[in-house]
Amino acid sequence: AELQHESFIFKGFRNVRTDASEIGNTLFSNACLPSTFFALKPGEHRLGPGMMAVRVLDSEGGRGLSAFFTRTTLKDLATNTVTTTVKPLPEGAPASFTGGVGVFLINAKPSTTELNIGDPISMDFEVTGIGNLRTMAAPVFSITDENWKIFDPAKTLTDEEDSDGIEPGIARFSQVIIPEFQANAIPSFELTYFNPINAEYV
């Protein structure tokens, strides 16, 4: 099955549920394919149609010996379209907001706690939770002076560890910082996200 839209990240199908139903004198197989998607921008969007290739029984059947065997035909099916409205995030987001929407926890580990002038420190962050880990950026250091050199963070997020909006996932960030003075402590950092359940920035 396939469903694409430039304004959404589509997480694919999972845990397909099947059952049967009878319509008239014909027995049909039903499949429910649940999924989730993450919006990239606000506004009204038309989602679909989704496309799916399925094998169906050949209604013409066969003649002679071939009638004893099941014949199938591959067909492309299209779903209906759905119009959805995505609300914009509230104004007043803190400067440390990096686009995360969901519920998250963060764990940080420095490569060393012995700080020396000019020695690099690698900060490893693990962000776990349910939400849009795919589009979330790294935590933000609360540094107001120029005595720290900060390098761009690297992000690691595999498809297997990504959150689908139902189950939690984990994203990893690694960032190098260098003190250019005799620092006594690693600078503080923040990960601010929007909690859609409480409708507030956390």
Question: Where are the predicted features?
Answer:
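Regulatory and interaction patches adjacent to catalytic/ligand-binding sites
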Residues: 1-202
